[in-house]
């Protein structure tokens, strides 16, 4: 069944309610998807894109119900991926001489998938036009790496419709086609999920390409995407969102993600979150167990966040496999303007947190101090986790902290100073254990109230057994 998009433009695509995996299993399409193909009937008849290859026969049969296939004058392929051009082999078997208009890179991709170099390919570049009669033209705009090298958009003059390919789309299936007909909350969530998981690596290209398209000074009454809705009500709203998301986007949000073997790292995650919320009640904190959560939801939250804390147990001296996989995904997505911190629990060896810190730094995150706990964290260890969360909240604050929080901190510091000027707390640079002069270290006969300067030179860190020379003044107390 076709749907009128505008005037002589009809949607002839395919809804896919049951699809749950995309790009292999890398993208969970929890709300299905659609493969949008468009038939333009002017003096010349034009088909823009096809559908996913698994619907090839249905697509060609449905298209026959709309038009004699021999009457299709041109085929435009904006993108050669199988969910866009998958039905070409089935269609071209019926009309083998029909001209195909696409980019030079698309020819390589189409031949790689369909193996028909004899098809009638016509290469187009940015600014090229194709007259389709009735005073209307198609204008082509190359958009390489949004998100494949072959990608392009097509603009129809007269009707002012931009066929935008993957840009501005979403994996979202609904019986309604237009953006003003569907649930707006669901639509926004799927748009952001789509951008975060698919287009984030190419954010540096989004703004200049949108600027280039706007530079044509062409009116845009509708944006017809390759997946999801057609934007007819205020279509530029999604363009404005893309410009916002492309500009090193972040919200006042922190994501905590972890995997755990014996629940110990989960306990750390909860305590860190408590410390963050206690110090900065305005910040949104979301916690995910990577083994039990939707990976794409996690990555969308990282995209939205100003920072991410990643936790892992140590297994065979390395991080948990699902955490390693998630960090590899984050490396590929090339997030920008975000901070990170690693944490985790261990038994006899704690190598995972160090490896995790290195991997996060390699992924482009600005790193903060990491945190380790040995075995199951006791109340003292959990308090260290809360303090770590408090320090993260202070370091990552986007604005001055609420006055009530500041006053509490000042009062505590004033009270401590009144009791005795014990000097700063010191942190082991290897394992992050903290020496608090107010508590001392009774196990080594260091009495409460002992400043660091008076701690014996033979003092050893209770966690890693290294000496005083590896201790530094706690960052939050450094002047």
UniProtKB/Swiss-Prot annotation:
Domain of life where this protein originates: Bacteria
Domain Flavodoxin-like: 254-393
Residues annotated as binding Fe cation 1: 79, 81, 147, 166
Free-text comment on the cofactor: Binds 3 Fe cations per monomer.
Keyword Chloroplast: no
Residue intervals of the Rubredoxin-like domain: 423-474
Cited CDD domains: flavodiiron_proteins_MBL-fold, rubredoxin
Subcellular location: Cytoplasm
A Pfam match: Flavodoxin_1
Matches recorded under SMART domains: Lactamase_B
Molecular functions (GO terms): electron transfer activity; FMN binding; iron ion binding; nitric oxide reductase activity
Keywords: Cytoplasm, Electron transport, Flavoprotein, FMN, Iron, Metal-binding, Oxidoreductase, Transport
Residues annotated for Fe cation 3 binding in this entry: 428, 431, 461, 464
Pathways per UniProt: Nitrogen metabolism; nitric oxide reduction
One GO CC term, this protein: cytoplasm
Region (Zinc metallo-hydrolase): 30-210
Chain's role: Anaerobic nitric oxide reductase; uses NADH to detoxify nitric oxide (NO), protecting several 4Fe-4S NO-sensitive enzymes. Has at least 2 reductase partners, only one of which (NorW, flavorubredoxin reductase) has been identified. NO probably binds to the di-iron center; electrons enter from the NorW at rubredoxin and are transferred sequentially to the FMN center and the di-iron center. Also able to function as an aerobic oxygen reductase.
Assembly mode: Homotetramer.
Family: In the N-terminal section; belongs to the zinc metallo-hydrolase group 3 family.
NCBIfam families on file: PRK05452.1
Protein name: Anaerobic nitric oxide reductase flavorubredoxin
Species this chain originates from: Escherichia coli O1:K1 / APEC
Encoding gene, per UniProt annotation: norV
């Amino acid at each position: 069944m076709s749907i009128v998009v505008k005037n002589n433009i009809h949607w002839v695509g395919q809804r896919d309610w049951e699809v749950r995996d995309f790009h292999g299993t890398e993208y969970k399409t929890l709300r299905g998807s659609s493969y949008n193909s468009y038939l333009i009937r002017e003096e010349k008849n034009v088909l823009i894109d096809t559908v996913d290859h698994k619907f090839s026969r249905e697509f060609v049969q449905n298209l026959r119900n709309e038009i004699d296939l021999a009457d299709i004058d041109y085929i435009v392929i904006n993108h050669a991926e199988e969910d866009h051009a998958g039905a070409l082999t089935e269609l071209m078997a019926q009309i083998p001489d029909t001209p195909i208009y696409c980019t030079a890179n698309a020819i390589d991709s189409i031949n790689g998938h369909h193996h028909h170099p004899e098809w009638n390919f016509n290469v187009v570049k940015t600014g090229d036009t194709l007259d389709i009669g009735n005073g209307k033209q198609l204008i082509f705009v190359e958009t390489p790496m949004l998100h494949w090298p072959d990608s392009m958009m097509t603009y129809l003059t007269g009707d002012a419709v931009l066929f935008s390919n993957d840009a501005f789309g979403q994996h979202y299936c609904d019986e309604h086609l237009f953006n003003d007909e569907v649930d707006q909350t669901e639509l926004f969530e799927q748009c952001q999920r789509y951008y975060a998981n698919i287009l984030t690596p190419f954010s540096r290209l989004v703004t200049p390409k949108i600027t280039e398209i706007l530079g044509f000074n062409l009116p845009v009454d509708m944006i017809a995407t390759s997946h999801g809705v057609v934007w007819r009500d205020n279509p530029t709203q999604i363009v404005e969102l893309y410009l916002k998301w492309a500009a090193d986007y972040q919200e006042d949000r922190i994501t905590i993600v972890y995997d755990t073997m014996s629940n110990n790292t989960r306990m750390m995650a909860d305590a860190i979150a408590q410390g963050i919320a206690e110090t900065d009640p305005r910040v949104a904190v979301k916690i995910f167990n990577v083994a039990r959560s939707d990976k794409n939801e996690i990555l969308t939250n990282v995209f939205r966040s100003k920072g991410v804390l990643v936790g892992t147990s140590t297994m065979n001296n390395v991080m948990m496999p699902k955490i390693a996989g998630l960090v590899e995904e984050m490396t590929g997505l090339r997030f920008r303007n975000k901070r990170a911190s690693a944490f985790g629990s261990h038994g006899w060896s704690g190598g995972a947190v160090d490896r995790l810190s290195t991997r996060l730094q390699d992924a482009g995150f600005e790193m903060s101090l990491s945190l380790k706990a040995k075995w199951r964290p006791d109340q003292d260890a959990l308090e260290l986790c809360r303090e770590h969360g408090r320090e993260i909240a202070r370091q990552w604050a986007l604005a001055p902290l609420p006055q009530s929080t500041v006053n509490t901190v000042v009062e505590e510091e004033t009270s401590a100073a009144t009791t005795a000027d014990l000097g700063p707390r010191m942190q082991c640079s290897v394992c992050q254990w903290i020496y608090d002069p107010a508590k001392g270290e009774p196990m080594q006969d260091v009495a409460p109230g002992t400043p660091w300067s008076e701690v014996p030179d033979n003092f050893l860190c209770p966690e890693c057994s290294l000496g005083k020379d590896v201790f530094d003044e706690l960052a939050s107390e450094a002047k």
